[in-house]
Amino acid sequence: MLCATKLKRVAQAARRLLFLVGVFFWAGCDYHVDSIYLGRKEAKFLGHVSQGDLKAVTLYLDRGGDINLQDEPGMTPLHHAVNADVRGSRLEMVKLLLQRGANVHAVDDTFYTPLHLASHMETAQVLLDAGADVNARTRRNGETLLFSAAWEAAQGRGKNYETYLNLTKMLIARGADVNLKLRSGSMIEEDAPYRDKPGDAPLHGVARSYSEVEASEVCSILIQAGARINEQNVRGHTPLDEALANERPQTADFLRSQGAMTGKEWKEQSPGNPEENRPVIQSSLNPAESE
C-alpha cells in the first residue's frame, strides 16, 4: 500500500495546510471571505474543531451553526476532527460532534469518510459505534481503512507499529473485509514492484514491506482472518510474487510456510480453469457515489 498510503498522507497534509492558512485568517486575512462555501464564522469554527476547542465549538453549535458544513475539499467538521487526531488527542471532539448530529457517512471530494482518516483505534471505534461503514471505499482506487492500517502496521515504525497493529486487529474484529481489492493501482511508476496494482488485496501490500518481521506478523493476522493467500491481482501476482519481486525473503518464507504459491505455480496446479482465481475487481461505489 506504498502509493495509496503516501497519497493519503499528502492529502492529509494538504488538509492541515488549510488551517495554517486559517491562522492568517484569524490575524486579519480575508481567506474564505469570498468563498462560496464558507463565511468567516464557519472558517473559524473549523479551526476550533481542528484545535480541539470544545467550548468554542459548543458555543458555535448552540447558536445554530451547521455541524455538517463542508469546505472546498468537501470535508465536514467531523473529517477535520479525525484528521487532526493524534493518538486520541481529538477523541472528545469527535464524540462531541457525533453527539450533536455530525454525519458519520459524509464523504469529501475524494469520497473519504471520516473513518478513512482515522489513525487511532479508539477514535475509529467511536466512529464505527456511530454507524460508520468499516468497508467504505475511496473513489479512485477503492481503498478501505484496513488497507492503509495494515500497510502502516507492516512498516514497523516505533510507536506507530502498535498503534496501527491494534487498529488493524480492531477493524477485522468489526467486520473489515480482508479480501477487498483495489480498483486501480499507483498513478506513478505503475510498473515498479513496490507500487500498488489493480486487484491488490491488503495482503499484497503488506507482503511488499521492507520491515519483514512486522510484515510477517501482519500477514499472519490477515491470513487468520480469512485472507486468501494465493489471491491474484490483475497481473496474476499473488502476495508471494510481491514479496519475491521486492526481495523480501523472510516474508516469502513465512508465506510459503502458510501454503503460498506464486501465480505461475498456481496456474500450473489449476489445470481445469487457471483463470478462476483471477480477481474480480469490485466496482460498486459507496452509496453516496451513485447520487
Regions found by a protein language model. Name each.
Residues C3-L18:
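Bacterial N-terminal signal peptides that target proteins for export
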Residues R16-W26:
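Bacterial N-terminal signal peptides
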Residues D30-Y31:
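Bacterial signal peptide processing site
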Residues K41, G74, F111, N141-G142, ...:
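Start-of-repeat signature of ankyrin repeats
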Residues G47-G52, H80-R90, L117-E122, S148-Y164, ...:
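Ankyrin repeat A-helix N-terminal signature
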Residues T58-D66, K95-N103, Q125-D133, K169-D177, ...:
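Ankyrin repeat domain, specifically the short helix-to-loop turn at the C-terminus of the second helix
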Residues D71, D108, T138-R139, L182-S184, ...:
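Ankyrin repeat boundary/linker residues
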Residues E231-N277:
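Leucine-rich solenoid repeat scaffolds
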